[in-house]
Design a protein with these regions (language model features):
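Rossmann-like flavin
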Residues: 95-206
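Glycine-rich FAD pyrophosphate-binding loop
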Residues: 23-61
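A conserved short coil-to-beta-strand element within the FAD-binding core of flavoproteins
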Residues: 245-274
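N-terminal Rossmann-like FAD-binding beta1-loop-alpha1 element of flavoenzymes
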Residues: 2-34
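Short beta-strand to alpha-helix junction loop
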Residues: 76-84, 211-237, 243-246
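Conserved Rossmann-like nucleotide-cofactor binding loop
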Residues: 14, 41, 296
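Conserved FAD-binding subdomain of flavin-dependent enzymes
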Residues: 57-105
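Glycine-rich loop(s) and the adjacent beta-strand/alpha-helix scaffold that form part
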Residues: 271-324
Length: 324
């Protein structure tokens, strides 16, 4: 049976992109696409972005916050890597620049405000450090090369391996300019996954030789919610897509089948965060369900000026749902 309707669990970039392509390439009606999400900021993960912002944001006196400031991470755009994203943004209009697509808006702004950082590293008493000298020794280079050139079918060797464990024979790398710049650019720690480091090395390999200036980084005109997410939201709303907010999907119902690899969703259970109630949504045979099985912010926590962010070892909402 040909599917005619779609349910999107979460309103993150991946699901919104899927909706755009269903409409433009699949000739679907927007009214047949429904998003169930906490808010229009992301996936089926933790508390809403607005809750955190309101708690930390003193709108009347921004510099008088007593808790701290939230600087959420963004996508570090690189045209040579983000080909699919730029294709997506070329399909939707900018919300601030009349007559431009969202991609043209970004290219126009970026061409006039090129990235060229003059001070990636600072050292007390010395000022700017020459980041051009990466500081890698031969063993660092060998281990990095092995990581980058590892075939995909061997990546499972890195299951549950931290970056510190991978480089245990050469901890020197963590005292190099390369590591200081790479970890702060891509939010890595030595406890992070070696698999994730390998994938980032593949994705952002162009930045390896220019990381001291980040000249390959392309920037949006405004923050990425306003320059990427908002154009998507406005376009999809204009196409008639349904956004059901304040919902966190907590469980799937599956059709009984003798086929191990045949997965058919027949229902969804979700929390109405606003009302504190549980809701059920039936899924018929004409509907396909899209779910992003993880989120980089899934188990994120926040600290403040006086308290470090607590460590959360529990599975986040998206990961817990995927495990079911």
């Amino acid at each position: 049976m040909r599917k005619k309707k779609a349910i999107m669990i979460g309103a993150g970039l991946a699901n919104m992109a899927g909706a755009v392509y269903l409409i433009q390439e699949g000739n679907w009606d927007g009214k047949d696409i429904t998003f169930y999400a906490l808010d229009t900021h992301g996936a089926n993960d933790g508390s809403t972005a607005s809750e955190a912002a309101e708690e930390y944001w003193n709108k009347n006196h921004p510099m008088e916050n007593t808790k701290g400031f939230i600087a959420r991470g963004g996508r570090m755009l690189n045209y040579r890597t983000y080909v699919d994203l730029m294709d997506l943004l070329d399909r939707i209009p900018s919300v601030t620049e009349p007559g431009m697509t969202a991609a043209e808006d970004t290219r126009d702004f970026d061409s006039k405000h090129r990235t060229y950082d003059k001070a990636r590293l600072l050292q007390g008493g010395k000022g700017i450090v020459d980041g051009h000298k990466l500081g890698l020794n031969n063993l660092d280079r060998i281990l990095l090369s092995r990581l980058v050139m590892m075939p995909d079918n061997q990546e499972e060797k890195l299951d549950n391996v931290t970056i510190a464990e991978y480089f245990e024979d050469s901890p020197h790398i963590f005292q190099t300019n390369f590591w200081y710049m790479w970890e702060t650019t891509f939010a890595f720690r030595t406890q992070s996954s070696a698999q994730e480091l390998r994938r980032y090395m593949h994705q952002m390999i162009y930045e390896f030789t220019q990381i001291e200036h980040l000249v390959g980084v392309n920037r949006t005109r405004y923050n990425q919610y306003e320059s990427i997410m908002l154009p998507l939201i406005k376009y999809l709303e204009g196409q008639g897509c349904n956004f059901v907010m304040n919902r966190r999907v907590t469980d799937f119902e599956f059709k009984d089948t003798p086929m191990q690899d045949e997965i058919t969703v027949t229902g969804l259970e979700m929390e109405n965060i606003e009302q504190g109630t549980v809701e059920h949504v039936a899924v018929d045979d004409e509907t396909v369900v899209f779910f992003t099985n993880g989120s980089i912010t899934d188990s994120a926590t926040l600290g403040d000026f006086n308290t470090p962010a607590p460590e959360n070892m529990d599975y986040g909402a998206a990961s817990s749902l995927w495990k079911k």
